[in-house]
Amino acid sequence: MQNDIEERKSDLMTDLWYKGKETRIKQDKQEKRVQMKNIVIFGAPGSGKGTQSDLMIEHYGLEHISTGDVLRSEIKKGTELGNTAKGFIDNGQLIPDELMIDILASVYDSFGRSHKGVIFDGFPRTIPQAEALKKMLDERGDKVAAMIELDVPEDELMKRLIKRGQESGRADDNEETIKKRLVVYHQQTQPLIEWYKKEGLHHHIDGLGTLERIFADIKSIIDNL
């Protein structure tokens, strides 16, 4: 009889330990979700997206994932994912979403579990990519906290980009090329903006004004996440 009681006590203690562990894991995940502020930033060429991303990195200590930079880095390092991506690029093909997500996941995981959040710049560009990003983060107990759209009127974007082209001598910053780039940007992002609105994550920022005022608007969003 005594042995039976002791066994039941032991089983109960074991059960309580496992339940406690599950609760702690769940709490850790919830805390991580609260602490991490993963931001998707949208902005047409010339919107000041790069400048505002730099300010967010400096102020909040966020990591930054720019798809263009990541691809160049992976290819330069000769990683398996980079070499696979290079094969598609060399053949004039688009990089499949699955491969792009694998590359982003690899970079995201390299930050460890103590980072404060990530700015996703240049990704997603399509709704399937947004869904894949959501799934990738969810598998890690994380999520996109906000999608921030820097909205600048097209005539102002044209002025900024033409001026930039004149100052830098960039041939791709002529008026005709700029118009094409802006058309492509709006075609790509409008469905995504609607998708993020449905997710309750879309935040609109007026991209006209001083850097300080625009960043103050961004801070008011991030500080209340």
State each model region's role.
Residues 3-225:
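Glycine-rich phosphate-binding loop of ATP-dependent small-molecule kinases
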